[in-house]
């Protein structure tokens, strides 16, 4: 591919296209990948469709002002995002250790973007072009639009609008608001006059003209009073709906952060249009010499079926970003994309995913949402399925069957996560059987996250009984179809509500599983989630109940070690945790003991685990009839 297949990145590109001045310039913390899994590509192509010229400055050197000037000054303004992931999450682990890789950067190496990228980029743009409008968006800006607890500073920070000095913030999925805002700018409206576009947030000194709004506790209140913080979050949480949500206002000293109600969800036709735009579907050729961009590998042959999630896991911020209403593409649109993939020269016959935040949530949860919006005080699937929930996998299954029939398609995988409780609610087993027979390869990843009902309740996850029933059914189905496939559980330690007793309960469950799970992570308090509010305040904002929060690094290390108690390096911490919890009965050589009396000889865990994995899985299969678990994916995306 040539540079002409991509949006312009240099003055040379502008000359070839006869562009003197760009309408917009997108500054992003990711490398430039022109694929619909990347927000920069979508917004750039949507604006191009509307007749605007758009340039890309990807991963500029924030220590060199000239990098921000290389495409000149745009006619209407700069659009700034940190990339597909919050820059702080991208740079640091849950234990605040620096990461050494970055899948969204050349060669997978870190160091191409600054901490708090949105703030840094905006300040540099202001330095280069003082009067040029700046609009911020993407995950980092969206989840920091109000005063928020910042785990890395361990303090409450102001709205990112204040710290970045940006003129406007677009939250959530930005196609509709950016089109409306860009057209208003084209018609001659000044950026500081754009105050009525849904899905936007701005700063105002005088709120007297506002009507029908809710004022939440101020920055000064939430930064000094944890009850006020919890109250502010509760209001934000309940008002994230395009039909019933109200304008929200939060005072920051003498100014106010004003959030307009969310944009309506995209219609199916609008979704189809967005995903049919002329993406190059790969990274820019300028990265070839550095080994390309690793992030493209998993998504290049994956298909986004829908957006949104009504699972409402407490540790996930999707409610604040994509929303609870499912927005799906038509089958025709998805089949066209699948057919197009088969004609790509590096297609090997495998479509890696057809899904979204949760693969088997392909339609709105219920008909009520269409007229009244999402329910304010209850969830669709937690603590149990709502009576209005539409439980049906037929349409999704018919789509998968059609994709499987496309010439040159060997296998269609589902990797974006299956919500197992929703699967169990479906009395028709056809999808479950087809999933096991055609759409996994040896193992299925799902996310029970924990097995203590006390912790699961705070996580917004189904009870242990639901998971155990799922495990039994999964293995029963695999036995009937003569497949020896396994479950890989994603588990989480140190979530609010998880004390040593709960961690030990989970460790005992793992013991019965028969193998050491590798997919374990500590709870990561990222902006925008209900769990992060619990972590900071020690309060469940929705119930106002006090919540135990493991914050000391020692206890967090103990809890994580308990989940991998068989690793020799974890022996001392596990023993200390068991003694502290008065569970010495789990130390010894008995069948239920987690560790022996004496520290085992240190072996290479990886080598040993690889050697025994098949044996352990075979044990696991037998044990699974009694107990077992599953799992799911990513930082941002554990279902």
Swiss-Prot record:
Presence of the UniProt keyword Iron-sulfur in the record: yes
PANTHER family: UPF0313 PROTEIN YGIQ
Protein's recorded name: UPF0313 protein CLJ_B0249
Transmembrane segments: none
Pfam families to which the protein is assigned, alphabetical: DUF3362, Radical_SAM, Radical_SAM_N
SMART domains: Elp3
UniProt: [4Fe-4S] cluster binding residues: 309, 313, 316
Disulfide bonds: none
Residue span(s) of domain Radical SAM core: 295-566
Region (Disordered): 597-639
Family the entry assigns: Belongs to the UPF0313 family.
Compositionally biased spans, kind Basic residues: 600-610, 626-639
Swiss-Prot/TrEMBL keywords: 4Fe-4S, Iron, Iron-sulfur, Metal-binding, S-adenosyl-L-methionine
A single MF term (Gene Ontology): iron ion binding
Record lineage: Bacteria, Bacillati, Bacillota, Clostridia, Eubacteriales
Protein's UniProt keywords contain Cytoplasm: no
Free-text remark on how the cofactor is bound: Binds 1 [4Fe-4S] cluster. The cluster is coordinated with 3 cysteines and an exchangeable S-adenosyl-L-methionine.
Cofactor: [4Fe-4S] cluster
């Amino acid at each position: 591919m040539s540079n002409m297949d991509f949006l312009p990145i240099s003055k040379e590109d502008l000359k070839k296209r006869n562009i003197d001045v760009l309408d917009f310039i997108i500054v992003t913390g990711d490398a430039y990948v022109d694929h619909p899994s990347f927000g920069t590509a979508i917004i750039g192509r949507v604006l191009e469709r509307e007749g605007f010229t758009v340039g890309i400055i990807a991963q500029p050197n924030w220590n060199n002002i000239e990098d921000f000037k290389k495409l000149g000054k745009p006619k209407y303004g700069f659009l700034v995002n940190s990339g597909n992931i919050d820059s702080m999450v991208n740079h640091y682990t849950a234990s605040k250790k620096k990461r050494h890789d970055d899948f969204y950067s050349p060669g997978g190496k870190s160091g191409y973007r600054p901490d708090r990228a949105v703030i840094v980029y905006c300040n540099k743009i202001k330095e280069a072009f003082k009067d040029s409008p700046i609009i911020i968006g993407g995950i980092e800006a969206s989840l920091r639009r109000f005063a928020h607890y910042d785990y890395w500073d361990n303090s409450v920070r102001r709205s990112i609008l204040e710290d970045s000095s940006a003129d406007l913030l677009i939250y959530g999925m930005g196609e509709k608001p950016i089109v409306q805002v860009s057209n208003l700018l084209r018609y001659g409206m000044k950026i500081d006059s754009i105050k009525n576009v849904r899905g936007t947030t701005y700063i105002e000194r005088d709120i007297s003209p506002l009507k029908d709004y809710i004022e939440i506790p101020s920055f000064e209140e939430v930064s000094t009073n944890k009850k006020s913080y919890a109250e502010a979050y509760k209001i934000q949480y309940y008002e994230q709906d395009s039909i019933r949500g109200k304008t929200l206002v939060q005072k920051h000293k003498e100014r106010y952060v004003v959030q307009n109600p969310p944009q309506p969800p995209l219609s199916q036709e609008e979704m189809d249009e967005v995903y049919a735009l002329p993406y190059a579907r790969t990274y820019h050729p300028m990265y070839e010499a550095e080994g390309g961009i690793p992030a493209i590998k998993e998504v290049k042959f994956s298909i986004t079926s829908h957006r949104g999630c009504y699972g409402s896991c407490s540790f996930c911020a999707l409610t604040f970003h994509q929303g609870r209403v499912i927005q799906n593409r038509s089958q025709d649109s998805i089949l066209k994309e699948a057919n197009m993939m088969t004609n790509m020269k590096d297609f090997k016959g495998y479509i890696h995913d057809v899904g979204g935040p949760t693969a088997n949530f392909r339609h709105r949860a219920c008909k009520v949402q269409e007229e009244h919006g999402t329910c304010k005080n209850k969830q669709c699937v937690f603590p149990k399925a709502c009576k209005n929930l539409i439980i049906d996998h037929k349409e999704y299954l018919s789509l998968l069957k059609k994709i499987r029939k496309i010439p040159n398609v060997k296998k269609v995988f589902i990797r974006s996560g299956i919500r197992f409780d929703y699967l169990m609610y479906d009395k028709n087993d056809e999808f479950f059987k087809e999933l096991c027979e055609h759409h996994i390869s040896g193992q299925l990843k799902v996310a029970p996250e924990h097995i203590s009902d006390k912790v699961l309740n705070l996580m917004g996850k189904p009870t242990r009984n639901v998971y155990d029933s799922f495990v039994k059914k999964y293995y029963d189905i695999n036995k009937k179809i003569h497949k020896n496939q396994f479950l890989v559980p994603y588990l989480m330690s140190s979530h609010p509500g998880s004390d040593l007793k709960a961690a030990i309960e989970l460790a005992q469950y793992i013991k019965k599983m028969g193998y050491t799970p590798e997919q374990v992570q500590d709870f990561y308090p990222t902006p925008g989630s209900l769990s992060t509010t619990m972590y900071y305040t020690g309060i469940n904002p929705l119930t106002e109940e006090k919540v135990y929060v493991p914050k000391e690094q020692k206890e967090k290390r103990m809890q994580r070690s308990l989940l991998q108690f068989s690793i020799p390096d974890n022996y001392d911490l596990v023993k200390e945790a068991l003694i502290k919890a008065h569970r010495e009965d789990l130390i010894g050589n008995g069948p239920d003991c987690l560790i022996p009396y004496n520290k085992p000889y240190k072996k290479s865990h990886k080598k040993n685990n690889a050697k025994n994995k098949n044996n352990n899985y075979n044990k696991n299969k037998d044990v699974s009839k009694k107990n077992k678990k599953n799992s799911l994916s990513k930082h941002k995306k554990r279902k």
